[in-house]
């Protein structure tokens, strides 16, 4: 999807409003199709981004200890129901060979992956794999905690239920002590 088709989205929103028994021409709804199209362009902007692009700039730094950025806020849209889920991502890696990336790049990669119709599990593994493929670190850990509106406002209706996913690569997959250490840092 290279460009969002605003006209198609607007037509679809009108059809949905009519299908639920609303009048899309009534005050309050008349501009809703345009607003929804604009919103979708923003919230699905990650469809045109490769998270690895954010790691293109690599800095030489003799540091082979943990780098962890935690509590990165994000939002995404559940691909099953097209309703939001949101939470925090924690991204850590142990650099190898003097290859580090900017801290903001970790947050940008999370954002690029989250801004598309998505699954939490896929966000977690995609960010981890992008780091592995570009930086080739000793280890990577990504932990994502989120509340899914598809569980909060429909179906089971359990507000506040948190879903936690993790992806561990390299050292963090093979060394239980290293994994336990970073998980304790994430917990704070």
From Swiss-Prot:
Class of enzymatic activity (EC top level): hydrolase
Coiled coil (residue ranges): none
Superkingdom in the source lineage: Bacteria
Keywords: GTP-binding, Hydrolase, Metal-binding, Nucleotide-binding, One-carbon metabolism, Zinc
Disulfide bonds: none
GO MF entry, a single one: GTP cyclohydrolase I activity
Associated pathway: Cofactor biosynthesis; 7,8-dihydroneopterin triphosphate biosynthesis; 7,8-dihydroneopterin triphosphate from GTP: step 1/1
EC number: 3.5.4.16
Binding site residues for Zn(2+): 78, 81, 150
Gene Ontology CC: cytoplasm
Entry's Gene Ontology BP terms: one-carbon metabolic process; tetrahydrobiopterin biosynthetic process; tetrahydrofolate biosynthetic process
Gene3D superfamilies, per the entry: 1.10.286.10, 3.30.1130.10
Catalytic function, reaction form: GTP + H2O = 7,8-dihydroneopterin 3'-triphosphate + formate + H(+)
InterPro entries reported for this sequence: GTP-CH-I_C/QueF, GTP-CH-I_N, GTP_CycHdrlase_I, GTP_CycHdrlase_I_CS, GTP_CycHdrlase_I_dom
Homology family: Belongs to the GTP cyclohydrolase I family.
Subunit composition and interactions: Toroid-shaped homodecamer, composed of two pentamers of five dimers.
Name of the molecule in the record: GTP cyclohydrolase 1
Organism: Halalkalibacterium halodurans (strain ATCC BAA-125 / DSM 18197 / FERM 7344 / JCM 9153 / C-125) (Bacillus halodurans)
